[in-house]
Regions:
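Conserved, single-site charged/polar hotspot
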Residues: 1-204
Length: 204
């Protein structure tokens, strides 16, 4: 691969973002860094066959989380699907390190990207309400959650976060690339898969 770069439209070197695990679908760059849309950094499905699900909708995201779709469920990938549980007092302590809103009553997703990652959420508590923008900010408030592609459920004093993936989800999924490599796909195939519209070009 010496002297090779990923080019877009033959003249621009692509900004090859990547994440640890997409969870099954990568994310549009505009929903993560709120920057200009890039054609080669749009959400793509990890599996060979795209699903007919809109992961920005919670009902479809739940179906997705209940599946093993994408990245071929690599044994080393502990973040493809995950679940985190907190007692009420634990969650209160975690959230109030960042937001001074008292006892947490609800956490609601106001906007999700194409991979189901939340990029706008509202936290409601006994002492106030805070709207948070940005998937990384949301994850940081929640004790550095694996990703913001999660659904929240609340039981009797117990909160459960069920999610997919690890990281922002933009660009190549490292776990997905490992899966494709194990299927004898070469690096050019993998790059085109995760950065649509690009070509691997030798420049020296």
């Amino acid at each position: 691969t010496e002297g090779m770069v990923i080019m877009f439209k033959g003249s621009h070197i692509a900004r090859a973002r990547y994440c640890s695990s997409s969870g099954g679908k990568t994310e549009d760059i505009r929903h993560v860094w709120f920057s200009a849309e890039k054609q080669y950094l749009k959400g793509v499905w990890d599996g060979e066959t795209p699903l007919e699900l809109d992961l920005s909708k919670e009902d479809d995201l739940k179906k997705f989380l209940d599946s093993d779709y994408g990245e071929d469920n690599i044994p080393m990938n502990k973040k493809h699907r995950w679940s985190v549980t907190y007692r009420q007092e634990e969650l209160d302590e975690i959230v109030n390190k960042s937001l001074n809103i008292g006892t947490i009553h609800s956490i609601e997703a106001l906007a999700r990207g194409v991979s189901g990652r939340i990029y706008k959420a509202v936290f409601k508590g006994s002492g106030g309400t805070e709207t948070v923008y940005g998937e990384l900010n949301i994850r940081k408030i929640l004790n550095n959650m694996n990703s913001s592609a999660f659904i929240v459920s609340k039981g009797e004093g117990i909160w459960t976060f069920s999610g997919a993936g690890w990281g922002h989800g933009v660009g190549m999924s490292q776990m997905g690339a490992i899966s494709l490599g194990r299927k004898n796909k070469d690096f050019k195939y993998i790059m085109k898969r995760y950065y649509p519209g690009t070509e691997v070009t030798k420049i020296y």
